[in-house]
């Protein structure tokens, strides 16, 4: 046993309080392949050494409590305790550190994101010895990730279901988000799908309100999907939001969607909760439904640089819990997303193996083994002039979603959809011909607009629209 650590079983029980670092700070520890590793941004209270702060995080998120207890002698703390094994200062920040913590795999229930988060971030964030605490990243070992189903279907299976290859998928959120009747809502869905979109979407707060009950919305949207499919010869879908007040009601809505024969449903995974989300993901795999995930409430958790949890952790958790799409920012639109950081967690969503890369905020090498990938969804304040940048940034395996950028077209919903489809096809063709979309993107759009009056009108409406604010989420 290391001389720098001690357990109550080895030294005998002595009542009282002692420093966490005596037991939970273990700089000589060599991490195991089966450990869950965490990187915390720690801001200690004045006078608290970083080693004590890091050890406190390890203790309070695993086996520790505020005082010694005699029942510690009934177990093996060296087997079950979290360990702060490395601390490094944050460059350019005063009294701020990255504390690396290793957790033994046996601390966590198999297949439960809920249990994992309850342990790692459930209680320690209110600890008085810390001014602020942020979970920056997690390394999920294959021994744990293999206990999860993951996404219901994944990227390749979705493409096969939709018979759509070689380009990003195109979507639209129906607006106004609240207040439409079910029939008028279905009309907007039909017009957008008929104009060339692959998907339309319920907004995250469309559930089952007095102005539009869920069953009515589902029926009219299904009618719109089938009509648009018959007229275009393409497979279409609408993200029917199954989020509800109870898990039982959520599954009932998903069952009805399956009975209607539609291809995809939707869930607000943070407000709905990980237990509900995992249940829905299992139902979707068993019944052939794709699952679109909205991240409503994420900025409450991830936007502050010094406290909370980075979205890359929420993205990893979603891949484990299950979802085929998830909103991931745009880099260029109205919602938060710095390019390198955004592409870092986009790769964590899509790829099988991601190398450690601190320049993109990736603290650990992550091996997902054979877990299916998740399509990132770019949505929020984007329009046709953004299409070249979005195509270049996100690549083919993505969903580009234009709400106001479709329904705000001066000629109506269907022309708005036409404009976006023409712009996307032009950008994909230009890229495939070897043109540089980052440099020539505007010219590509101008050339395409000569052959599409719908695109020309969209270009005129949105030529001056920009969202130029400094990103909060930077390295």
UniProtKB/Swiss-Prot annotation:
The lineage of its organism: Eukaryota, Viridiplantae, Streptophyta, Embryophyta, Tracheophyta. This is Ribulose bisphosphate carboxylase large chain. It comes from Illicium oligandrum. The modification N6-carboxylysine is found at residue 201. Pfam families: RuBisCO_large (PF00016), RuBisCO_large_N (PF02788). It comes from the Eukaryota. The modification N-acetylproline is found at residue 3. The record marks 334 as: Transition state stabilizer. Heterohexadecamer of 8 large chains and 8 small chains; disulfide-linked. The disulfide link is formed within the large subunit homodimers. Belongs to the RuBisCO large chain family. Type I subfamily.
